[in-house]
Amino acid sequence: MPKGEPYIPETITVHLGRPDADAMNVEVPFADYIKNVASSEIYPTWPEAALRANIYAIITFALNRIYTEWYRSRGYPFDITDSTQYDQKYTYGREVFENINRLVDEQLNTYIRRQGTIEPLFAAFCNGTTVTCEGLSQWGTVGLAEQGYSPYDILTYYYGDSIDLVQNVPVQTSMQSYPGFPLELGYSGEDVRLLQIQLNRISRNYPAIPKIGEITGS
């Protein structure tokens, strides 16, 4: 279940295989994960606008997996896999490219969302040559960048005009929506505060649910 406003997690847990494969899980800093994926998915020689557009998509895809608890809600002890069949390519132990390292540092606190929503977009992408999809074409971004498209223009070309780039997103420790025990009357603290945020978010779609006036965790 979504956990209030999205944030940039300090770390992400990656499963080094297909979801059901007997493979190792590694917890890595989120920034290092994005740099690794970008260095594994795209080429550092591409135009900067293409690189930036792809990095926005990579960040957003990972945040969507974390925010929706796609794997954890299904009982898996990880946030994302390294399989391009399911997620995006993570190469355990690889070096990253210098310019991609710099661009990720500049863009890390930004993600894509659909206007009118708060959750990170499911920013699907593929290489656009051997594999095509309804989302972003990695090689297609190169041609658009060479035509003078900005990173945002490239993103709207593939994901539509109804997207925003959310900037200055805070970094915090990742927390699952279920604390591991039932909350009871009289409880207070961060778990209660998160539940209050969730209820207020749900009430946007179901107005009959009254909003909690002050989010205090008590």
What residues fall within each predicted segment?
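Conserved, single-site charged/polar hotspot
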Residues: M1-S218
